[in-house]
Amino acid sequence: MKDHIKQKLTVLPDQPGCYLMKDRQGTIIYVGKAKVLKNRVRSYFTGSHDAKTQRLVGEIADFEYIVTSSNIEALILEMNLIKKHDPKYNVMLKDDKSYPYLKLTNEEHPRLVTTRKLKKDGGKYFGPYPNAGAANETKKLLDRLYPLRKCRTLPDKVCLYYHIGQCLAPCVYEVTPEQNEQMVQEITRFLKYGHKEVKVELEKKMHKAAEELNFERAKELRDTLGYMEAVMEKQTMMVNDRVDRDVFGYAYDKGWMCVQVFFVRQGKLIERDVSIFPFYKEAEEDFLTFIGQFYLQKDHIKPGEVLLPAGTDAALVEQLLDVSVHIPKRGKKKELVDVAMRNATMALKEKFALIERNEERTIKAVEQLGEAMGIPTPYRIEAFDNSNIQGTDPVSAMVAFIDGKPNKKEYRKYKIKTVTGPDDYESMREVVRRRYVRLLKEQRSLPDLIVIDGGKGQIAAAQEILHDELGLSIPVCGLAKDEKHRTSQLLLGDPPQVVPLKRDSHEFYLLQRIQDEVHRFALTFHRQTRSKTFFQSVLDDVPGIGEKRKRQLLKHFGSVKKMKEASIDDFLALSIPKSVAETLYNKLQTK
């Protein structure tokens, strides 16, 4: 533990507040809240942690804290800080999933529309609905019942909706505010309290039309009633009071948490939201943070009631959300919470089972690859690829796959030092020599298989260094590509021969992943090198800019493009003399 962190830990207050963990660059990587800052922050640096939390702690180079007057204030501050800084370890609610709502617009002549965006525009929102189809079906029903305006802008003459009785045509005829308000109130009543009253009214109108021998109107009303039943009775009644409520349940294990939210509208369960994410604090605290973010950051409409599982600080949530919050102990509401909890537990178990199955499948692919090649199982695979443009800025890269999975800590980058011009074979010899001479000197583990992104020539170059120069008997294979630059053949042996592999096999897919990854890594490194070289060359001809100032400019701007966008004042702010800044600015504008 760093000395300055030790000193900070000794003076932490025993008050509520938020803490901000930073990495070496000063970037905020995690934000948390605590009832007692002293206890919570110290817990990160003492005792044992799971691998996931240990990874977070390993990146902490410093921390700050903000004291608040209460736990609720700390919770609100935490959510605001997460929203502002978007720390990489605060990964709750990263998805962009949004649900459809029905909206009554706040206009002189209101419209009923479906939307996924909730805005503070004076409109009335109803939902959420499980999908766009359900929202549109309900809207279609209401359009048949209440002839509100349909057009976004009023046309010069009546449209089709007027002729089919679904619009009063305020574009041509006068529609009073009282008429609009009555329809808005009836739609609101329908969407908030259900369709039973509307159904009774329609039945009365249907019978009256039949008595008056207006059979066409009676048939229209009968069809509308049938359509209403088809739309509204698709959901099973869960609770009889028709209150809109959200039901929360959660489960946690092995450093992961699953939260499930059931949306109950008009007594019916219409949809659920599932979130699975890693957590680093106490489970109950992260659960509270999730609830706050769910409403305050994702803009979900707050319902009439929120149901929570036992052990949750309901009073704190009620204070935060300003809605009725309950922890039910019996009856239908308790059953709903229990179902949400059970579903959260099952979703978490399913996640772990899928991870385990994927790991088993990956290991199986490694074993099958060894069998196909006639070599011992290659648990550690190292792959190489070269990258250059007509011999300029030549580089090479190596990736390591252990048990079939990439291990990025073992990746290596190489600038080619001894080769001039575009010579792929000599570049391969240099890199293979540098890699394995070093491993031998340091007495480190050698790979079970070496993969070369190339054909027979590259394989021969690698084998020459390994077998003839270093006396190593590591198998070397090559991955040849077709005319569409896709992995097509596996080559092995001396001389290299094609190893038959089915293109849809797990082992072929593993090789494809390895080839794609080493190619990506090499290409990225080459672009960085080329950009840096160009950056340096631009500055070479500017008097007054030496190596120190080059590094300063590179660190500050990052690219020539950013430098070209800079003004002379931007250069002066870096303590560069005015004459040098003007020369640099003029040179960049001519590039």
UniProtKB/Swiss-Prot annotation:
Q: Which GO terms describe its molecular function?
A: DNA binding; excinuclease ABC activity
Q: Which residues cross the membrane?
A: none
Annotated UVR domain residues: 196-231
- Tell me where on the tree of life, at the top rank, the source sits: Bacteria
Annotated GO CC locations: cytoplasm; excinuclease repair complex
* InterPro entries registered for this protein in UniProt: GIY-YIG_endonuc, GIY-YIG_endonuc_sf, GIY-YIG_UvrC_Cho, RuvA_2-like, UVR_dom, UVR_dom_sf, UvrABC_protein_C, UvrC
| Localization annotation | Cytoplasm
One family from Pfam that matches here is UvrC_RNaseH_dom
Q: Does the keyword Lipoprotein apply?
A: no
Residue ranges of domain GIY-YIG in the record:
14-91
Its GO biological process terms?
nucleotide-excision repair; SOS response
Role noted for this protein: The UvrABC repair system catalyzes the recognition and processing of DNA lesions. UvrC both incises the 5' and 3' sides of the lesion. The N-terminal half is responsible for the 3' incision and the C-terminal half is responsible for the 5' incision.
The record's listing under NCBIfam families reads: PRK00558.1-5 (NF001824), uvrC (TIGR00194)
Q: Which HAMAP family match?
A: UvrC (MF_00203)
Q: This chain belongs to which protein, by name?
A: UvrABC system protein C
